[in-house]
């Protein structure tokens, strides 16, 4: 707690001032977390001061809040290119990232509990920079980081604004941003070192070395490229759902089975089901083999039944036997190929069709989906054309 508080003071995050009249004063609290390494071991214990952003009033102490993050398909595309050209892939972390964003609004906050000024106990903090928990915190941080990168000569992609590229002479660098977690890949290590040094002038940058663990995804170097999987995340999910002793199944769903909102008895408490399906949805980042099953389960979050819960547990049982399944990125061709398909009126509840597509860059799968169409197709041809339209839109 003391280290976090001192970091806030060093960063000139606020200055004390008398409590204003007719102004909203945001409360705060301390949040404690255990940071883990990729193997599940404890890295460090962390305390963070978090503002209670729900105290904020729209138009008074915040306006714009949107902040982009890197798209999963962009990450896969960049890693495929890095493997193909044998580029270095490094991971960076910015300490206390949200504290670097400059606030445009006038925001007041109570003094942190346990660190009140003994001389001015009733004073409040006038925030000069952002702090965790504020509604605009992610946006202010992204704007600050993107400005720093553009001053170094980087350009934001028009397709994915969290991808920044630098091209000069023979040097090429890609920077992928997900809040304060950053992937950097380049054709030269010297360029990466220079970037880290330049960013270090403004931020506390940690070079985490070769990419190995990013957003819960484990990245392993293989003889021909990279292997991405979420084995640790899947194991943690099985523990959380008390299914470590479950018998594995060979498939995530029963072939030909159709889930209906009318089948089974409604669950008295749908919390477990919703938590389970939400976690499974995150696993689809590296598990296209469960995308269809998870898409079906997501359609019953509002009123799940015991039949739906059994279907969700079947996916977990499938994961139990396929923990190391994931994506393999190998060197090879850079030809872009897309494949799509659709059923027709397959949903028993509303007779809408389900589309699916896979997009490969060479042999590397970089994008996929399984999704119910938004309208009822009047023929199988129409359903196929709609599926093709979504695929082409993703390609271009």
Give each language-model segment a name.
Residues 1-396:
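Long, low-complexity, charge-biased intrinsically disordered regions
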């Amino acid at each position: 707690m003391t280290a976090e508080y001192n970091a806030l003071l060093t960063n000139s995050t606020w200055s004390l001032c008398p409590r204003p009249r007719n102004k909203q004063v945001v409360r705060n609290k301390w949040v404690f977390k255990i940071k883990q390494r990729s193997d599940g071991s404890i890295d460090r214990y962390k305390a963070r001061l978090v503002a209670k952003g729900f105290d904020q009033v729209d138009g008074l102490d915040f306006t714009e809040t949107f902040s982009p993050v890197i798209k999963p398909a962009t990450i896969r595309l960049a890693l495929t290119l890095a493997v193909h050209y044998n580029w270095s892939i490094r991971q960076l972390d910015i300490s206390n990232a949200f504290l670097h964003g400059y606030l445009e609004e006038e925001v007041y906050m109570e003094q942190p509990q346990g660190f009140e000024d003994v001389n001015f106990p009733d004073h409040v903090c006038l925030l000069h920079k952002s702090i965790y928990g504020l509604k605009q915190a992610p946006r202010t941080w992204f704007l600050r980081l993107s400005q720093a990168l553009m001053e170094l000569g980087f350009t934001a992609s028009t397709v994915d604004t969290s991808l920044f590229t630098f091209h000069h002479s023979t040097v090429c660098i890609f920077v992928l941003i997900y809040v304060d977690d950053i992937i950097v890949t380049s054709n030269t290590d010297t360029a990466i070192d220079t970037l880290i040094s330049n960013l270090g002038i403004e931020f506390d940058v940690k070079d985490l070395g070769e990419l190995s663990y990013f957003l819960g995804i484990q990245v392993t170097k293989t003889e021909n490229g990279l292997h991405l999987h979420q084995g640790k995340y899947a194991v943690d999910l099985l523990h959380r759902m008390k299914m470590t002793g479950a018998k594995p199944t060979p498939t995530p769903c029963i072939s030909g089975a159709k889930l209906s909102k009318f089948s089974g008895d409604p669950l008295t408490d749908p919390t477990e089901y919703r938590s389970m399906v939400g976690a499974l949805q995150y696993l689809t980042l590296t598990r296209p083999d469960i995308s269809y099953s998870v898409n079906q389960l997501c359609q019953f979050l509002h009123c799940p039944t015991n039949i739906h819960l059994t279907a969700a547990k079947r996916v977990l049982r499938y994961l139990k036997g396929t923990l190391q399944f994931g994506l393999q990125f190998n060197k090879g061709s850079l030809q872009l190929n897309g494949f799509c398909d659709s059923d027709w009126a397959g949903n028993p509840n509303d007779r809408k069709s389900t589309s699916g597509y896979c997009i490969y860059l060479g042999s590397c799968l970089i994008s996929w989906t399984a999704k119910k169409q938004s309208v009822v197709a009047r023929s199988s041809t129409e359903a196929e054309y709609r599926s093709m339209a979504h695929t082409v839109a993703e390609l271009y």
